[in-house]
Regions:
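Bacterial N-terminal signal peptides that target proteins for export
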Residues: 1-13
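A Zn2+-metalloprotease active-site environment signal
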Residues: 8-11, 18-290, 296-299, 309-311, ...
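Short hydrophobic beta-strand segments that form the core of ligand-binding sensory/regulatory domains
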Residues: 103, 391-395
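Surface-exposed amphipathic alpha-helical segments
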Residues: 119, 305, 394-432
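Residue-level marker of beta-strand positions
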Residues: 296, 302-304, 472, 478
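Signature of long, low-cysteine stretches enriched in small and polar/charged residues
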Residues: 341-389
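Primarily a LysM-type cell-wall glycan-binding module
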Residues: 425-455
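Extracellular LysM carbohydrate-binding repeats and other cell-envelope/extracellular binding modules
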Residues: 458-489
Length: 489
């Protein structure tokens, strides 16, 4: 959990992308459109950074940028100020914004098998920009599940609260869904770009196979972003192979002429954070522990908890109540009392009770109030805790007719906030990819057995390496393993 701007600001910004331009001539229209597209992309890029954060690895960022810029230079729009980013997210995903802004997650980079695969994915996103799909596509909002519950998991009550009313009740990125034809067009364009700069064009097909394996490993609620928002993988694998064949024939190439870059990618992936980063908070039983901010909070038993970059969200099993922990958006020098008064005033809240609260030995404020959202009234318990120079805001929400059933539980959870003193939790680090040399010829399963400290399942290791557990690894070859992370019960 970190302090970031609200979701509403990002929604407003992305809605702005859909506004039509008015121009007088074809050339002026194109120039204005390009300038407007670039400026919109730049503004959105700031919001993306605030919402998700860029992965802090200069070498990896430069590596991804170098791959992207070489292909962009061969595209139909080489003069755009292309920008390539690695997002600090474990979800396997990639997307592009108008103006030449392309994003891949560290999760996607970790699962790529070689540089040609990564180039295929980046080329695909370049294809969305060069194809101007964002200008012509049918706009449809959906939540990208980057560390938060997808909107479809919320009840109607919670969705109402997410979409209107209380500021910062949930965060997420509103993306626009491309048509099937646009996705396939981007695939074909990306394969062409990758081939034109010397990559093996079959790379993206290999990555589609990895996505297919992840889809088979996951239940449907956990399908990676690049699977859940794109056409059927089987169809894309078949088409990508055909387009790769055509690209090879067009340039009169053989596979020996083209670059795969397995060792090159593995050198960059070695040490990359894998999965959720516990430094930004993790669950141990019902307790949420945050090592960097040094606090803990007990959420109600059996509630579904998701940790995002700007908030921690918990929803009751019946989806009738909602808890959210976040940092209050205080103005510089604003006292806690002044912030709470301003917050309630800006909400037009009807306050029924307020005052000091007992949260251990920490100074805290509490208010019970109601707000209007989506033509309905909601009851809210707000708790504000002044700790270590920050003001923490905990909101407990339910409908008025369910308030008695949940208010005591939500108050107990809010008042469990305390300093984190567990040294083991304070020192926990993230799991990381480790490129490991194999000492003798053996099956992948045997390699894993040699390292009992591997912190992910054997099936995940197999997918990371594009292998089966029975595949033989030659002596001296390397594989991706994962070590570290919190020791969860």
């Amino acid at each position: 959990m970190r302090s970031h701007p609200t979701f509403r600001a990002l929604i407003a910004l992305l809605l702005l992308l859909s506004l039509p331009a008015s121009v007088s001539t074809a050339s002026a229209w194109q120039d204005d459109k390009d300038r407007g597209e670039i400026e919109q992309g730049r503004e959105a890029d700031k919001q993306i950074e605030a919402q998700f954060g860029f992965y802090d690895d200069e070498e990896l960022s430069a590596y991804v940028s170098e791959i992207g810029n070489r292909m962009a230079a061969m595209s139909e729009r080489p003069t755009l100020p292309w920008t390539f980013r690695v997002l600090d997210s474990p979800v396997v995903n990639a997307f592009a914004l108008p103006g030449g802004f392309v994003y891949v997650t560290r999760g996607l980079v970790a699962y790529a098998g070689n540089e040609a695969e990564l180039a295929g994915v980046i080329g695909h996103e370049i294809g969305h920009v060069t194809g101007k799909h964002s200008q012509s596509r049918q706009r449809r909002s959906l939540f990208a599940n980057l560390g938060l519950l997808a909107a479809s998991l919320f009840s109607e009550t919670v969705r109402d609260l997410v979409s209107t009313g209380l500021p910062q009740l949930a965060t997420g990125l509103v993306l626009m869904k491309y048509s099937r034809g646009q996705e396939l067009d981007a695939d074909e364009r990306g394969i062409g770009y990758a081939t034109s700069v010397g990559y093996n064009p079959y790379g993206i097909g290999g990555f589609f196979e990895t996505l297919q394996s992840l889809e088979e490993q996951s239940d449907r609620k956990k399908v990676p972003g690049w699977v859940s928002t794109h056409p059927q993988v089987d169809d894309r694998i078949e088409r990508s192979r055909r387009w790769a064949d055509e690209a090879m024939a067009r340039y009169n190439l053989t596979t020996e002429d083209l670059f795969v870059g397995r060792r090159e990618l593995l050198a960059e992936v070695d040490g990359v954070v894998f999965g959720e980063n516990p430094r930004e908070g993790f669950m141990r039983g019902d307790d949420f522990l945050h090592p960097d901010l040094r606090f803990r909070l007990a959420f109600p038993a059996d509630w579904t908890v998701q940790n995002g970059r700007s908030a921690v969200v918990a929803i009751s099993p019946s989806e009738e109540a909602y808890l959210k922990l976040e940092l209050a958006a205080r103005e510089e020098g604003e006292a806690p009392d002044d912030y709470v008064r301003r917050y309630l005033r800006e909400l037009s809240a009807d306050v029924s009770d307020s005052g000091r609260a007992d949260v251990g030995d920490l100074a805290a404020l509490e208010a019970v109030f109601s707000v209007q959202a989506s033509n309905a009234t909601y009851a809210v318990l707000g708790t504000w805790i002044d700790y270590d120079g920050r003001l923490y805001q905990i909101l407990g929400v339910s409908s008025p007719n369910r308030w008695r059933a949940y208010s005591r539980t939500m108050r107990s959870s809010a008042r469990s906030f305390a300093e984190l003193t567990d040294e083991t939790a304070l020192e926990v680090g993230p799991a990381r990819v480790a490129v490991t040399e194999v000492s003798q010829r053996m099956q992948l399963a045997g390699v894993i057995e040699q390292y009992p400290e591997v912190s992910v399942s054997p099936e995940t290791v197999a997918i990371l390496n594009h292998l089966s557990l029975q595949d033989l690894i030659a002596a001296g070859d390397v594989v991706k393993l994962v070590f570290g992370g919190p020791d969860l019960p």
